[in-house]
């Protein structure tokens, strides 16, 4: 019987394979009879226009669609500059060789394409901003970050944060797929710019929201890079190596490799690099310091994969290893406002941080049938690092010195974390639109750290601490969410019912020891610290539970859609603290939050829309904020946790409008948002007579308000060769806190520091304005770009009634000359001027230049680059708190030059034909190929 069953099964498999057929043909230009390369071919189901398979013609105009099941289909053949070709075909029991397909020219499209530079820089498609990458020229060996810096409305900070028209980008996708789990710098600083066709800025829904059609709290603003169609089958990448010297005769080097293996929708990318020029090509392994705070040396290697196994199963993931070493040197000033008094402090700090990190993430999507989708996502992370720092400081009250001192710290840490998410979605064939979705996830983390601290402070007396602290913590969480979607009287009216549960268990142990041996810090041996410090040691256990009950309604019309919902979120917190003296204190807290949520979107057309949305969200305090134990590692700032904290609850509302004019290629978009937070987590600061502050996180009884907005306009002018862009940002923010001066806090009393007295209410209100203008001129032989930025900030604190204003002016210009013999000259210059930054008001002019020579039949590029030729680069930051304004100046990389060589790996469609030859033979060049695939809207879910 068993053998019979196996035989029958094999027979069915064989019959299914035999039933699959091949469709092939050749595409020609109807006017000259020449075969057409890189023409897009799509096969759709005749019943519902579902895409079954796609292909592109080769250099002979030939295409083949493999393993097509019998049935009725629509074949669509399209290429820019030609009219589409459509043919209804029926596949039965034999292969089909269609007659030659003749594409006729689209006269109107050709007129537009004949004028070079007519491609719009920016197109608005609903809620998606789409930049045309080929409208922006970059160096031959440029990476994606170089391309992003040229896009109107895009800003990249020194820390690598990307904002588009004032909105922060959270993650990166490539062709709709995860690339190193959204690690922004892994994509922007490794991928070659010339592979990119479109840059799409959009809001990415979570996997569950894509399956249910109802948005949740996990929607993020992302960038999706679509690759050029001729880069989707083959091997391509860049290998770059360079070396040079800086002004201090220190060797500077930069080596990087990125190789991509593409097979349609399946892709594998290998990245590796090492440098000491502050180019952090991954956010992983960085530790707590910023990308450009000081001098950084990094090494990284990673592998990313997305594989379409078959129609039912997709698999992907990534693994990476990163190491970084950072040396930072900072000078900072801080002005703290108290009632009737002002504290000023000046600090000098040096630090060395060394960090290693390894990550593995896997992901799979299985569709056992057309009604069921299963997604699983495991991940694990390991991190270890060491740190050393030295700090000296001086504090003044009303310009009189109150204390001064120095501190030395050294430590190490290790942590491991992981998680697993499982999503199951089931549609019901008995009623279209009905679905049941379950999302279950769990995660854990464990960490251990050791810190050695030697500090002394001089005020009215001298205080010295010589201590060793060991911290261990572990965390485990389980989350479950079930959604049932039910169409009402028709598919335009849909109701979603959601039940969710979240549980988090945390345990944190802190043991502190002191030593009278003054050499103990230099030895850094825990055994030298033999005095257990009860007041600064404890064991904290915390359990947090949250239940969510949610009801959402969605109404959809062709022109508009509406979603309304209500959510109730009860939460319970149970904690117990075991102190070093053996005593323990329990704590229990229960709260409930109610929040409506809604969204309304009106589509005036495919290129114009208006949206209004609102959402409420709960944020749980961290263990460090809740753990009720004193921390004296900083003699001028002692902290203690607050186990009585409530979760904060934010109310967020936003208005968005976008439009695109197809006649003028002009784009307009604007957004305004507001956020009000209930029970916001703020800081309570108590100052003693020496300027030392005791701090504790508390819930604010005021409602912090944040209002922000942006207006963007982009249009081509002067025969569409010159592009103009303006982006305006406005903001209003209030920060609350509590502050009290000259209070005598009994440091030896555990009860006193745990129940820190509440200070006077302090708040800082801040107005901000930013205007950015840009012009770009593009020609075959020359490109000129100019960008101007003005930023204004106005800050007022209620305790000092003192106004703080800062002004920033930045003018950026770049020029590219393409000379004979494959030589390119590049130069960019940035002028910036700062006013209002305390002692750091300075001007700087940053001038970079390079000359590139293409060799080896355009596969290699030899470059000479000079960075910061005038030696003026600064690194200054401003930070505004509820009762303070601070300014920090970091050390930065000095001027240097570098000679480098880059080699481009190109092998497409089984041919080793040079990529530049391909583009010279192409009828319209690189900027005129069909668009890449758009990310899925509500229906797809492979872009996570």
Predicted region positions:
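Outer membrane beta-barrel strand-and-loop segments of large Gram-negative receptors
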Residues: 348, 477-479, 531-537, 640, ...
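A short, solvent-exposed loop/turn motif at the edges and junctions
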Residues: 45-50, 72-88
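Short Pro-Gly-centered beta-turn/loop motif in secreted/extracellular proteins
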Residues: 36-37, 64-72, 80
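Signature of Gram-negative outer-membrane beta-barrel scaffolds
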Residues: 494-608, 797
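Membrane-proximal, glycine/serine-rich, low-complexity loop/turn segments characteristic
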Residues: 20, 60-62, 76, 83, ...
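Short, acidic Ser/Thr/Gly-rich low-complexity loop/linker segments typical of extracellular
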Residues: 46-62
């Amino acid at each position: 019987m068993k053998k019979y069953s196996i035989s029958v099964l094999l027979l069915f498999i064989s019959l299914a394979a035999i039933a699959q057929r091949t469709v092939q043909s050749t595409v020609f230009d109807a006017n000259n009879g020449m075969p057409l390369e890189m023409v897009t071919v799509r096969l759709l189901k005749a019943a519902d226009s579902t895409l079954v398979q796609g292909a592109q013609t080769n250099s002979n105009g030939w295409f083949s669609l493999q393993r097509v099941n019998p049935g009725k289909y629509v074949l669509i053949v399209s290429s820019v500059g030609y009219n589409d070709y459509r043919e209804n075909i029926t596949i039965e029991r034999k292969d089909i060789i269609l007659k030659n397909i003749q594409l006729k020219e689209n006269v109107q499209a050709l007129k537009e394409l004949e004028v070079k530079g007519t491609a719009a820089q920016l197109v608005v498609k609903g809620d998606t901003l789409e930049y045309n990458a080929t409208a922006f020229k970059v160096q031959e060996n440029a990476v994606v970050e170089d391309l992003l810096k040229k896009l109107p409305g895009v800003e990249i900070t020194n820390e690598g944060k990307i904002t588009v028209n004032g909105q922060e980008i959270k993650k990166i996708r490539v062709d709709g797929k995860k690339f190193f789990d959204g690690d922004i710098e892994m994509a922007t600083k490794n991928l070659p710019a010339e592979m990119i066709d479109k840059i799409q800025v959009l809001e990415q829904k979570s996997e569950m929201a894509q399956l249910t059609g109802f948005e949740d709290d996990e929607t993020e603003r992302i960038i999706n890079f679509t690759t050029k169609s001729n880069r989707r089958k083959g091997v391509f990448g860049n290998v770059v190596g360079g070396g040079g010297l800086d002004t201090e005769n220190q060797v500077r080097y930069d080596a990087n490799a990125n190789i991509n293996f593409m097979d349609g929708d399946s892709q594998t990318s290998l990245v590796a690099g090492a440098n000491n020029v502050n180019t952090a090509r991954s956010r992983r392994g960085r530790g707590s310091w910023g990308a450009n705070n000081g001098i950084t040396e990094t090494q990284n290697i990673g592998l990313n994969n997305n594989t379409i196994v078959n129609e039912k199963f997709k698999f992907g993931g990534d693994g990476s290893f990163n190491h970084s070493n950072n040396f930072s040197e900072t000078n900072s000033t801080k002005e703290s406002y108290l009632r009737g008094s002002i504290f000023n402090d000046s600090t000098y700090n040096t630090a060395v941080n060394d960090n290693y990190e390894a990550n593995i993430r896997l992901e799979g999507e299985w569709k056992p049938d057309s009604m069921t989708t299963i997604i699983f996502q495991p991940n694990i992370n390991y991190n270890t690092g060491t740190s050393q720092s030295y700090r000296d400081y001086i504090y003044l009250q009303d310009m009189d010195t109150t204390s001064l001192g120095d501190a030395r710290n050294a430590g190490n840490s290790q942590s491991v974390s992981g998680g697993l998410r499982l999503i199951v979605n089931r549609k019901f064939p008995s009623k279209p639109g009905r679905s049941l979705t379950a999302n279950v996830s769990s995660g854990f983390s464990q960490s251990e750290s050791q810190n050695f601290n030697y500090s002394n402070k001089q005020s009215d007396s001298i205080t010295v601490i010589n201590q060793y602290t060991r911290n261990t913590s572990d965390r485990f969480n389980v989350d479950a969410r079930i959604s049932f979607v039910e169409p009402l009287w028709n598919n335009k009216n849909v109701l979603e019912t959601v039940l969710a549960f979240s549980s988090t268990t945390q345990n944190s142990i802190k043991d502190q020891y002191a030593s009278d041996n003054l050499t103990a810090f230099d030895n850094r041996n825990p055994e030298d610290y033999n005095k257990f410090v009860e007041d600064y040691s404890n064991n904290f256990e915390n359990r947090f539970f949250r239940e969510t009950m949610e009801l959402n309604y969605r109404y959809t019309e062709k022109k508009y859609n509406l979603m309304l919902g209500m959510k109730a979120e009860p939460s319970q917190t149970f904690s117990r603290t075991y102190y070093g003296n053996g005593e323990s204190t329990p704590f229990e807290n229960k709260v409930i939050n109610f929040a409506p949520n809604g969204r309304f979107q009106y589509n005036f057309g495919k290129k114009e829309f208006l949206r209004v949305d609102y959402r409420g969200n709960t944020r749980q305090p961290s263990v460090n904020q809740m753990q009720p134990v004193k921390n004296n590692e900083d003699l001028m700032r002692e902290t203690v946790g607050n186990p009585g904290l409530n979760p904060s609850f934010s109310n967020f509302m936003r208005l968005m409008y976008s439009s695109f004019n197809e006649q003028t290629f002009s784009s307009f978009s604007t957004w305004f948002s507001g956020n009000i937070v209930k029970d916001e987590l703020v800081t309570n600061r108590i100052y003693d007579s020496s300027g030392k502050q005791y701090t504790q996180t508390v819930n604010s009884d005021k409602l912090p308000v944040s209002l922000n907005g942006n207006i963007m306009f982009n249009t081509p002018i002067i025969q569409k060769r010159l592009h103009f862009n303006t982006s305006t940002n406005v903001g209003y923010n209030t920060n609350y806190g509590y502050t009290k001066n000259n209070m005598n806090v009994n440091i030896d009393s555990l009860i006193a520091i745990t129940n820190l007295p509440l200070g006077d209410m302090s708040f800082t209100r801040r107005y901000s304005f930013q205007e950015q203008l840009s012009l770009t001129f593009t020609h075959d032989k020359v490109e000129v770009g100019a960008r101007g930025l003005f930023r204004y900030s106005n800050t007022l604190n209620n305790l000092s009634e003192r106004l703080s204003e800062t002004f920033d002016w930045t003018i950026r210009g770049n020029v590219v000359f393409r000379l004979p013999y494959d030589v390119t000259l590049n130069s960019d210059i940035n002028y910036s001027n700062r006013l209002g930054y305390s002692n750091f008001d300075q001007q700087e002019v940053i001038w970079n230049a390079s000359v590139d020579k293409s060799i080896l039949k355009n596969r290699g590029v030899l470059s000479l680059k000079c960075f910061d030729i005038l030696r003026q680069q600064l690194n200054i930051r401003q930070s505004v708190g509820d009762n303070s304004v601070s300014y920090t100046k970091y050390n930065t990389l000095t001027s240097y030059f570098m000679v480098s060589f880059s080699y481009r790996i190109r092998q497409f469609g089984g041919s080793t034909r040079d990529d530049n030859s391909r583009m010279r033979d192409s009828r319209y060049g690189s900027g005129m190929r069909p668009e890449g695939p758009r990310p899925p809207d509500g229906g797809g879910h492979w872009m996570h």
